[in-house]
């Protein structure tokens, strides 16, 4: 019998790749749901070593990071840009209709 797959752990492995992380965040942005984007960003940060490591790198208190990325969180744009930068993701505006990679790769 095949062991059950821990989907969260598999997602975190995939999100360690900056291109996959960017595609994941783009998909969340395109969905137009702020909560979905914050959850996606939280998952990308988890793939980068977790909130303690991110807190050390950003000098933002770990508890504050959890609050700003919670379902009721409201991080400022400056903090979002900082968290993206720490994750190796560059934020830019592109014209509507431009194709972007929005799928995670399928791994076997």
Name what the model sees in each region.
Residues 68, 96-97:
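Residue-level "edge-of-site" marker
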Residues 48, 74-77:
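Residue at a beta-strand N-cap/secondary-structure junction
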Residues 59-75:
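Recognition helix of helix-turn-helix/homeodomain-like DNA-binding domains
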Residues 47-49, 60, 97-108:
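Compositionally biased, non-globular sequence tracts
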Residues 76-94:
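DNA major-groove recognition helix of helix-turn-helix/homeodomain DNA-binding modules
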Residues 1-43, 100-107:
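N-terminal flexible/basic segments that precede or flank functional cores
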Residues 38-56:
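Short basic helix-loop element that most often maps to the first helix and adjoining turn
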């Amino acid at each position: 019998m095949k062991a059950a797959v821990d989907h969260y752990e598999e997602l975190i492995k995939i999100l360690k790749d900056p291109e996959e992380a960017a595609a994941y965040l783009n998909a969340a942005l395109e969905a137009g749901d702020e909560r979905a984007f914050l959850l996606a960003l939280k998952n990308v940060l988890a793939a980068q070593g977790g909130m303690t490591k991110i807190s050390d790198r950003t000098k933002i208190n770990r508890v504050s990071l959890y609050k700003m990325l919670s379902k009721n969180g409201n991080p400022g744009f400056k903090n979002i840009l900082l968290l993206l930068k720490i994750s190796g993701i560059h934020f830019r505006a592109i014209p509507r209709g431009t194709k972007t990679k929005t799928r995670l790769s399928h791994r076997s």
